[in-house]
Structures are given as C-alpha cells and as structure tokens.
Swiss-Prot record:
Compartments it resides in: Cellular thylakoid membrane
InterPro entries: ATP_synth_OSCP/delta_N_sf (IPR026015), ATPase_OSCP/d_CS (IPR020781), ATPase_OSCP/dsu (IPR000711)
GO molecular function, one term: proton-transporting ATP synthase activity, rotational mechanism
Any single GO CC term annotated in Swiss-Prot or TrEMBL for this entry: proton-transporting ATP synthase complex
Listed name of the protein: ATP synthase subunit delta
Main location per the UniProt record: membrane
Sequence similarity: Belongs to the ATPase delta chain family.
Length: 185
C-alpha cells in the first residue's frame, strides 16, 4: 500500500475529489484529522491491511468493517467517499489517498511537514521551539511535525522540510569537523 508511482497517479484524483467535497462542506480540517487517524490505523493494523487488500473478502464485508471502524464521529461525506472506494475497488489506495489529501491540505493552509529526528524524545517546550524555528526558516503559517528518535545522533536534532535538511545534531557536527580536518566521515 505504500506509495509507488502508479498508486500516486491513481490516488491523486481521488484526493482532489475528497478535497473538493471537504471544501464544499467546510470540513477540510476534520477530514485531515480523519485521514491522519486512518493512516495511523492502517500502519498499525495488519488485520485491517489484510482485509482491505484481500480480493477474497466481499465488498459488503469490507464496508461493514469500515463503517464500524469509522463510527458515528466520521462525517457522512467521508464515509460515503470510503464506501465509493470499496465499490470502485480502489480501497487498496486508501492510505495513499489520505497522504495525498494531507499534502493538498498543507498547501491550502500554508503548512509544512517537518520530519524531526532527535537523539531522545522531545519535550512539549522543545517541540514548540522547533516549530517556531521552522516557521521562521520557511515562512509557513503552520508546521506539522512528525517526530522520531535516533540515539545515533548523540545529541541535537535533524529537521527535514521538503528537500531541505537542517542538521543540528552532534553526529553531524562531528562529521563536519572531520571533513574540515581532511578526514572522511
């Protein structure tokens, strides 16, 4: 289910259609929250992935499970969209469609996605400081942070925004010192 070129090409028009529905009903942020939840569930649940990917499981069964999983809190527009994906046999692209939707939402709201890797878990205060720094560097109105921990960094953080990487880690500083001294990192 991870994004290949083909799945991206299939997912993009569906994500744009979902964005059109969300904008028409002023639900862009709610759909964004629901997409984030769906992505998290799909990444965590092998059983749900198996259900979605299985050609043996009937569409009616897939719909019943998805309806139960989505619950009453989900917008009927989003639920209908997901049921349409099942009918069109495009439900296997649900995760990619949600990713593409979030990309469109970030463009719409002038928000950047920052992948922050640190040597240890960041506190709320540190996350706010990183968010403020990213806003200053990019001029974005909002920042969506995806954090991960890599003890090999020794200390500090690396921040990836789009194709730019800001390396403020101790490992990166040691590598730069080594290179400046004529060594190989």
């Amino acid at each position: 289910m991870k994004g290949s070129l083909i799945s991206s090409a299939i997912a993009e028009p569906y994500a744009q259609a979902l964005m059109s529905v969300a904008q028409a009903h002023n639900l862009t942020e709610q759909f964004g929250d629901d997409c984030r939840s769906l992505i998290a569930i799909l990444e965590e649940s092998r059983d749900l992935q198996g259900l979605i990917l299985s050609p043996v499981i009937k569409e009616t069964d897939k719909k019943a499970v998805l309806r139960r999983m989505m619950g009453d809190r989900t917008s009927p527009y989003l639920l209908n969209f997901i049921m349409l994906l099942v009918d069109k046999r495009r439900i296997i692209f649900l995760e990619e469609i949600c990713q593409q939707y979030l990309t469109l939402l970030r463009k719409l709201t002038n928000t950047v996605l920052a992948e922050v890797t640190s040597a240890k878990e960041l506190s709320d205060r540190q996350c706010r400081a990183v968010t403020d720094k990213i806003k200053d560097l990019t001029g974005a109105q909002g920042v969506e942070i995806k954090t991960s921990v890599d003890p090999d960094l020794i200390g500090g953080v690396t921040i990836k925004v789009g194709s730019q990487v800001f390396d403020a880690s101790l490992r990166g500083q040691l590598r730069r010192v080594s290179l400046s001294l004529g060594g190989t990192a």
